[in-house]
């Protein structure tokens, strides 16, 4: 969105306010300024008058002009095709430095002296407005010969480009920007004077009638204009339109574009003569379409869809004699819903209507007619035809205390009311300190108290709000369902990190397969199972995982690592949460380190994976028919059995066509991850000792472990089994080696402290009937 200071001056008194302050103010109220740049004609460029023009004898394209600049008459050779006697022009005199760096000097062109240059707008550093030189007129101010061009406001201006968010369609006009600036700078907004109807002219009812359906989603205002000759766009409008890339060849379209950019009101101009016969009444039909948009038509001929596009055949031409001017507004929500159903679209029109154009149609029409009335040989038909549907605006109750609470500091009631009034809000004071607020139609984004607070803060300035810590008072929203979700999510992440892929299966299973695996069936049977294979609720996750692993093995997968987390049911139909794992086949892929001969998965590998997923646990002997009698165990956490682990029985491996396979199933409700309390790390070195102990075959290491833990030796950091050895000489015994690590957190240990602990450990082992090797 491009604005200039001089254009803003049409709506606000900004002569005493610098462009820098305007830019800072715009930024502070949420209208982001992209750039600020000067638009100034060079020095020594003055107003001149072409007194005489003759052809150059030695050139077909050059003319010799006598140009009066007040103090003298200059002879200037000019190559512009549009130069002629009787014109006011911009004259660059000797010594002028042009924007491209060229210095104007006296010169001879084809043997004729030339003492200056007649300039185009492009040569002066402005946008191009026409072919040839720029012709001056009094739209820029009174023309005085010899007056420096940069003393005219339009030629000594500053351009401001702003970036608008999609919800600020109300600022897509000079009037909209000025409205916000008026509130921020406490200025009065200039409104266009209501158009004064001329006497002794025909009324619009003679040539135009509206036929409209009820409940249209829009507002409409029509005026008629009679043209006796083609009109021209004056210099001021041309320069401003060129700055916003809105200058076209059709003068009527140019005036509409100018009025739209100035006021924000959308306009269409229809050529009456191209549709209706002479002396025929022009009846405009307005009908609401399926998606809420309004179709504007004459008989069976489409004129436009409001806010979406205008039919090119209905547009006014250079030779149009009677034109109908339409100012319209359509609810932006309707445009958003309807635009996708129209192949033909006017992007510039949609850009405004989709964000919300200015609904003050009379303001826009008065502004446009104020331009038309200064154009000669033109008749403005009296009166207008309007369709103004009353849209009930929502009422937002507010209080100054509520606004102060949200903002974080007390705000003055009068200041709040003044800000809201300047922004166009309707205020209705009620009892008990409440104020009912109606947001203006041009601000459809204002929905609640928070939006109103944002408007107040925007105008006051966020920098003027004192910083204050926010107090968040909120009850704990962490319930058991959320905690379960986080717990299960973390388990899934750790399983995936260990190389396992998650499987998902139906909660139904094959009862016969479960029975063969040794699992009980639920008491209640399914009356109408979806398939014969899924005829009961599952009591384990393992059967589905075994079937999935078997399918993968048949598809030549060498490493099969799967897990599933889900619900199972006990024999009493109670739902339980379980997680199960399966690792079948090879331990790793073939690679250089294993000489392309990877080993099959081992029990220890599988145990290590489970430890990485659920943490430390203990193993105790078990007896499950589904598992190998030589490689199986129950898993305990804090002396509570939470599941089992082991190798799948060889018979079942063969039945399912599986390679070496290990499985594990755990009760999710029993493996909660408690918060670990961090302890300080000792800076002092550890002392290690090893013991080799003879134990009978079949003796459980857990007995040794439990007895040592019961000693509660303060300096014993950890101990672990590091070796198991047997040979013929040991007969019915194993030799196991246990490594002990001792450390004090406060000091370096002495040997006698460690020896004392080792003696206690040896006595404990003797009490178990064990001897050193």
Swiss-Prot record:
UniProt entry tagged with the keyword tRNA-binding: yes
Binding of Mg(2+), residues: 445, 451, 454-455
Domain FDX-ACB: 682-773
Domain tRNA-binding: 39-150
Catalytic activity: tRNA(Phe) + L-phenylalanine + ATP = L-phenylalanyl-tRNA(Phe) + AMP + diphosphate + H(+)
Pfam families, per database record: B3_4, B5, FDX-ACB, tRNA_bind, tRNA_synthFbeta
Cofactor(s) of this protein: Mg(2+)
GO MF, one example: magnesium ion binding
Main localization category: cytoplasm
B5 domain location: 391-467
Origin: domain of life: Bacteria
InterPro entries found in the cross-reference section: aa-tRNA-synth_II/BPL/LPL (IPR045864), B3/B4_tRNA-bd (IPR005146), DNA-bd_dom_put_sf (IPR009061), Fdx_antiC-bd (IPR005121), Fdx_antiC-bd_sf (IPR036690), NA-bd_OB-fold (IPR012340), Phe-tRNA-ligase_IIc_bsu (IPR045060), Phe-tRNA-ligase_IIc_bsu_bact (IPR004532)
Cofactor note: Binds 2 magnesium ions per tetramer.
EC nos: 6.1.1.20
One GO cellular component term noted in the UniProt record for this chain: phenylalanine-tRNA ligase complex
Compartment(s) where it occurs, according to its Swiss-Prot or TrEMBL record: Cytoplasm
Subunit structure and binding partners: Tetramer of two alpha and two beta subunits.
Family that this chain belongs to: Belongs to the phenylalanyl-tRNA synthetase beta subunit family. Type 1 subfamily.
Protein name in UniProt: Phenylalanine--tRNA ligase beta subunit
Organism of this sequence: Campylobacter jejuni (strain RM1221)
């Amino acid at each position: 969105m491009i604005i200039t200071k001089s254009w803003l001056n049409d709506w606000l008194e900004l002569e005493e306010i610098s462009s820098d302050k305007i830019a800072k103010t715009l930024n502070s109220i949420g209208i982001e300024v992209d750039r600020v740049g000067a638009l100034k004609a060079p020095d020594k460029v003055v107003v001149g008058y072409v007194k005489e023009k003759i052809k150059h004898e030695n050139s077909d394209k050059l003319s010799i002009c006598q140009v009066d600049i007040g103090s003298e008459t200059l002879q200037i050779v000019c190559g512009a095709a549009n130069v002629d006697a009787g014109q006011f022009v911009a004259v660059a005199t000797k010594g002028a430095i042009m924007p491209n760096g060229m210095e104007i000097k006296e010169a001879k062109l084809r043997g004729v002296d030339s003492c200056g240059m007649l300039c185009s707008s492009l040569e002066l550093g402005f946008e191009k407005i026409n072919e040839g030189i720029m012709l001056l007129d009094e739209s820029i101010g009174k023309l005085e010969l010899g007056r420096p061009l940069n003393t005219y406001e339009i030629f000594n201006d500053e351009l401001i480009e702003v970036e608008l968010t999609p919800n600020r369609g109300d600022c897509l006009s000079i009037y909209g920007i000025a409205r916000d600036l008026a509130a921020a700078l406490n200025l009065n907004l200039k409104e266009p004077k209501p158009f004064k109807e001329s006497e002794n002219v025909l009324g619009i009812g003679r040539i135009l009638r509206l036929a409209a359906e009820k409940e249209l989603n829009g507002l409409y205002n029509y005026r008629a204009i009679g043209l006796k000759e083609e009109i021209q766009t004056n210099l001021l409008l041309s320069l401003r339109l060129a700055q916003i890339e809105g200058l076209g060849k059709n003068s009527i379209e140019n005036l509409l574009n100018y009025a739209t950019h100035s006021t924000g009101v959308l306009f269409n101009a229809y050529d009456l003569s191209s549709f209706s016969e002479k002396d025929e009444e022009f009846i405009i039909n307005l009908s609401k379409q399926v998606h809420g948009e309004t179709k504007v038509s004459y008989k069976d001929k489409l004129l436009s869809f409001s806010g979406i596009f205008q039919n090119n055949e209905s547009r006014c031409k250079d030779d149009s004699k009677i034109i109908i001017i339409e100012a319209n507004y359509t609810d932006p929500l309707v445009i958003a819903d309807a635009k996708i159903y129209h192949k033909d679209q006017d992007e510039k029109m949609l850009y405004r209507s989709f964000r919300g154009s200015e609904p003050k149609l009379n303001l826009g029409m008065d502004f446009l007619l104020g331009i038309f009335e200064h154009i000669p040989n033109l008749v403005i038909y009296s009166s207008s035809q309007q369709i103004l549907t009353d849209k009930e605006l929502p009422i937002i109750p507010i209080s100054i205390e509520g606004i102060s609470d949200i903002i974080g500091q007390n705000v003055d009631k009068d200041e709040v009311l003044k800000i809201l009034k300047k922004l166009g809000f309707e205020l209705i004071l009620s009892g008990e300190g409440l104020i009912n607020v109606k947001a203006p139609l041009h601000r459809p984004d204002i929905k609640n108290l928070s939006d109103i607070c944002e408007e107040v803060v925007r105008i006051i300035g966020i920098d003027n709000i004192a910083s204050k810590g926010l107090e968040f008072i909120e009850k704990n929203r962490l319930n058991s369902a959320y905690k379960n979700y986080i717990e299960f999510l973390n388990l899934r992440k750790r399983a995936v990190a260990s190389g396992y892929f998650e499987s998902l299966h139906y909660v139904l299973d094959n009862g016969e397969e479960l029975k063969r695996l040794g699992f009980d069936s639920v008491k209640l049977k399914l009356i109408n199972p979806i398939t014969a294979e899924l005829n009961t609720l599952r009591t384990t996750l393992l059967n589905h995982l075994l079937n999935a692993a078997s399918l993968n093995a048949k598809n030549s997968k060498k490493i099969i690592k799967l897990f599933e987390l889900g619900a199972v049911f006990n024999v009493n139909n109670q739902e339980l949460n379980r997680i199960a794992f399966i690792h079948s086949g090879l331990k790793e892929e073939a690679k250089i380190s294993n000489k392309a001969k990877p080993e099959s998965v081992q029990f220890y590998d599988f145990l290590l994976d489970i430890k990485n997923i659920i943490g430390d646990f203990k193993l105790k002997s078990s007896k499950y028919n589904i598992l190998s009698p030589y490689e199986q165990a129950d898993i305990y956490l804090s002396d509570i059995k939470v599941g089992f682990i082991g190798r799948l029985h060889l018979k079942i491996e063969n039945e399912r066509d599986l390679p070496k396979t290990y499985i594990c199933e755990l009760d999710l409700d029993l493996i909660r991850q408690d918060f670990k309390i961090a302890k300080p790390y000792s800076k002092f070195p550890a002392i290690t000792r090893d013991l080799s102990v003879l134990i009978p075959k079949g003796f459980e290491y857990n007995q040794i472990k439990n007895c040592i833990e019961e000693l509660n030796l303060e300096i014993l950091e950890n101990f672990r089994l590091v070796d198991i050895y047997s040979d013929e000489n040991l007969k019915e015994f194993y030799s196991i080696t246990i490594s002990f690590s001792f450390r004090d957190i406060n000091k370096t240990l002495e040997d006698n402290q460690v020896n004392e602990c080792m003696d206690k450990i040896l006595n404990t082992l003797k009490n178990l009937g064990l001897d050193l090797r």
